[in-house]
Curated annotation (Swiss-Prot):
Subunit-level organization: Part of the 50S ribosomal subunit. Contacts protein L32.
Family that this chain belongs to: Belongs to the bacterial ribosomal protein bL17 family.
Organism: Coxiella burnetii (strain RSA 493 / Nine Mile phase I)
PANTHER family noted in UniProt: LARGE RIBOSOMAL SUBUNIT PROTEIN BL17M, RIBOSOMAL PROTEIN L17
Keyword Ribosomal protein (UniProt): yes
Protein known as: Large ribosomal subunit protein bL17
Length: 126
């Protein structure tokens, strides 16, 4: 039975799913806006939001936890120095998921995931 199980399987093994969500989180922190399928976008929120909350308090322990989840030094530095300070006053809801129509090949529902207080000077990825 599938009672009280949280999270989506996304038709992947647990290792593949974990690696995919890690890569998507790194891409989101790097570009601050990514395009993906709607179920992946909704699942990505569950990875990104706690990381930004963690980064609000800049300690060595928190940086190590973030590195353990992202495995990218440059992105961890950006998360703690640029992204988290922008969201200091916000009590959650750091990323926005916008529906973006359907993919041509298989009509999969697409979505744009963006950080709420992202810099507008960033070029959009369409």
């Amino acid at each position: 039975m599938h009672h009280r199980k949280s999270g989506r399987h996304l038709n992947r093994t647990s290792a593949h799913r974990k690696a995919m969500l890690r890569n998507m989180a790194v891409s989101l922190f790097q570009h601050e806006l990514i395009k993906t399928t709607l179920p992946k976008a909704k699942e990505l929120r569950r990875v990104v939001e706690p990381l930004i909350t963690l980064a609000k308090e800049d300690t060595v322990a928190n940086r190590r936890l973030a590195f353990n989840r992202l495995r990218d030094d440059a992105i961890v530095a950006k998360l703690f120095k640029e992204i988290a300070p922008r969201h200091k006053e916000r009590p959650g809801g750091y990323c926005r998921v916008l529906k973006y129509g359907f993919r041509n090949g298989d009509s999969a529902p697409m979505a744009i995931v963006e950080l709420v207080d992202r810099e507008e000077s960033e070029s959009s990825e369409d």
